[in-house]
Amino acid sequence: AGALSNLDAKARLPWFGPTMSARSFATARLMETWAHGQDIFDLLSVRRKNSARLKHIAHLGVTTYEWTFKNRGLSAPLPIPYVCLQGPSGEAWSWGVSSSVDLVTGMAEDFCLVVTKRQHCLDTQLQMMGSAIAWLPLAQCFAGPPVDSPAPRGKLV
């Protein structure tokens, strides 16, 4: 974190896949730590208490919408869905243009579990409409080759 704090937030850094801004680089490291930490919580069957920092991971999940499709050699369906999530303390977080046709709504934790490939979207309480139906099963907020979602296991929540 010390080295990153000395960089301009918009400075481009090389990484796997496209270059990233220093801010996105730091967010991606937070996402990786959270996602792999979730693997440990799941292994131990312990429920995690999330904080407002989850918003950074949700933001990364939203901003990688088009990249998710490009990474698979597909064209992203437009428009980009409106995403409205409830944070851990009940606050509303939203991205995009409000729409009743192309949207994702639900808990931020569910969304973050989906975009980090920890859970299939059908195993959450996320509501999807329009272009979000094609997106969420593929959604991937990390660099590298496409990774498939875990197989749906039926509603867990």
Indicate where each model-derived feature is located.
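Structured surface interface patches that mediate subunit assembly and partner/cofactor docking
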Residues: G2-V157
